[in-house]
């Protein structure tokens, strides 16, 4: 038998075996129906869609035996209470961001996004190969939660401002919709953090109730129309260098799954995680050009502002580490890898990207 014939027959044989195995698996697989509470509205299709990717993959892999029904923010529980509903068993799972629960325990935020942490590539490396998933779940177990990465936006923008800010002095008295760790850091520089629900941000900006707001990035931000009332779009979002969205599962419900279903669930989470970042990388370039065409003025945060924010963030970290052992354990792990990651990132990746950006700006791409 020649090699080509052997490969063809092997492929056919493998396909036949899979076809025979699939019905057998379907017949023996238990029926599971879960509800997932998303922290996001359906209008933000890329980030909300992460849960739909998970649901679709699980249904297809189990011939419909493992179903996860996805509900948008507010349909079952308020978006910022999704993890609480999982802890209590009101729902089996949620799709949310850990920093929403900063007030419960700042440790929730570490595996999601905190100031001057890792990039999307860096945080993914830490999660999957640096023990990050296990460290986070060790902490979450006290809340009856098991979590896996379920999406990443890439580094976010720094927000929409009604006026320019060029120095730290310009931040004094600035009313900005920003919360959690970032709000605590900015407060030290004179900013007055505001907690405002997503649907109330636009009118607050329009009326001047707030001077600025952070959100996500070009694709999502354009949909909300902030450019119409706040022309200055600053970058980067130093508090969200690689924000991870998580799928959080009720620990008892997760442990009640068969080993096969647990494996399929983790695989689907991983696929949804990768897919979201790919979508944002695909959609943001078009969106940023559209925003600029509509009058948006892009502005980088000045080195003075970034350095001041970095120093203030380190002060907050020191306070957290001194008072919260769980926070310190995870942050120590992230810090150690952050140093290694940026040692490598500044060599090949940074120089390649820098060269290509020069070519782009010269009109050669």
Swiss-Prot record:
Gene Ontology cellular component list: periplasmic space; tripartite ATP-independent periplasmic transporter complex
Positions contributing to Na(+) binding: 156, 214-215, 240
Positions with a binding annotation for substrate: 99-100, 156, 177
Biological process terms in GO annotation: carboxylic acid transport; transmembrane transport
Posttranslational modification: Predicted to be exported by the Tat system. The position of the signal peptide cleavage has not been experimentally proven.
Pfam families assigned: DctP
Signal peptide start and end residues: 1-26
Keywords: Metal-binding, Periplasm, Pyruvate, Signal, Sodium, Transport
GO molecular function list: metal ion binding; organic acid binding; protein homodimerization activity
Gene3D superfamilies assigned: Bacterial extracellular solute-binding protein, family 7, Periplasmic binding protein-like II
InterPro entries per the UniProt record, alphabetical: DctP_fam, SBP_TakP-like, TakP/all3028, TAT_signal, TRAP_DctP_sf
Keyword field contains Metal-binding: yes
Cellular compartments annotated: Periplasm
Record keyword Signal present: yes
UniProt record similarity statement: Belongs to the bacterial solute-binding protein 7 family.
Function recorded in the entry: Part of the tripartite ATP-independent periplasmic (TRAP) transport system TakPQM involved in the uptake of alpha-keto acids. This protein specifically binds alpha-keto acids including pyruvate, oxobutyrate, oxovalerate and 4-methyl-2-oxovalerate. Ligand-binding affinity increases with the increasing chain length of the aliphatic backbone of the ligand. Is not able to bind alpha-ketoglutarate.
Subunit structure: Homodimer. The complex comprises the extracytoplasmic solute receptor protein TakP, and the two transmembrane proteins TakQ and TakM.
Record-given protein name: Alpha-keto acid-binding periplasmic protein TakP
Biological classification of the source: Bacteria, Pseudomonadati, Pseudomonadota, Alphaproteobacteria, Rhodobacterales
Name of the gene encoding the protein in the UniProt record: takP
């Amino acid at each position: 038998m020649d090699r080509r014939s052997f490969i063809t027959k092997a492929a056919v044989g493998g396909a036949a075996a899979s076809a025979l195995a699939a019905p057998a698996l379907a017949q023996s697989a238990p029926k599971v129906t879960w509800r997932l509470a998303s922290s996001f509205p359906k209008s933000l299709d890329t980030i909300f869609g992460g849960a739909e990717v998970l649901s679709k993959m699980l249904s297809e892999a189990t011939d419909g035996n493992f179903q996860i029904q996805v509900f948008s923010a507010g349909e079952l529980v308020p978006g910022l209470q999704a993890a609480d509903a999982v802890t209590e068993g009101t729902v089996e799972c949620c799709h949310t961001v850990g920093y929403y629960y900063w007030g419960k325990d700042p440790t929730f935020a570490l595996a999601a996004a905190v100031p001057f942490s890792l990039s999307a590539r860096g945080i993914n490396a830490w999660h999957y190969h640096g023990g990050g998933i296990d460290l986070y779940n060790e902490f979450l177990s006290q809340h009856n939660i098991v979590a896996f990465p379920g999406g990443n936006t890439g580094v976010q923008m720094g927000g929409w401002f009604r006026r320019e800010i060029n120095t730290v002095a310009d931040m004094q008295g600035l009313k900005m919709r920003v919360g959690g760790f970032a709000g605590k850091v900015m407060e030290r520089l004179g900013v007055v953090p505001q907690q405002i629900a997503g649907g109330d941000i636009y009118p607050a900006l329009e009326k001047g109730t707030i001077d600025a707001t952070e959100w996500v990035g070009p694709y999502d931000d354009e949909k909300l129309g902030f450019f119409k009332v706040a022309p200055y779009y600053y970058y980067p979002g130093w508090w969200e260098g690689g924000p991870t969205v998580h799928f959080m599962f009720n620990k008892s419900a997760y442990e009640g799954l068969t080993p096969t279903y647990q494996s399929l669930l983790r695989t689907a989470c991983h696929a949804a995680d990768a897919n979201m970042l790919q979508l944002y990388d695909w959609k943001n370039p078009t969106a940023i050009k559209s925003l600029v065409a509509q009058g948006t003025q892009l502005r980088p945060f000045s080195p003075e502002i970034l350095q001041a924010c970095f120093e203030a963030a380190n002060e907050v970290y020191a306070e957290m580490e001194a008072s919260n052992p769980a926070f310190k354990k995870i942050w120590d792990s992230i810090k150690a890898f952050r140093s290694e990651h940026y040692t490598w990132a500044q060599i090949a990746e940074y120089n390649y990207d820098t060269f290509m950006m020069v070519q782009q700006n010269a009109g050669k791409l």
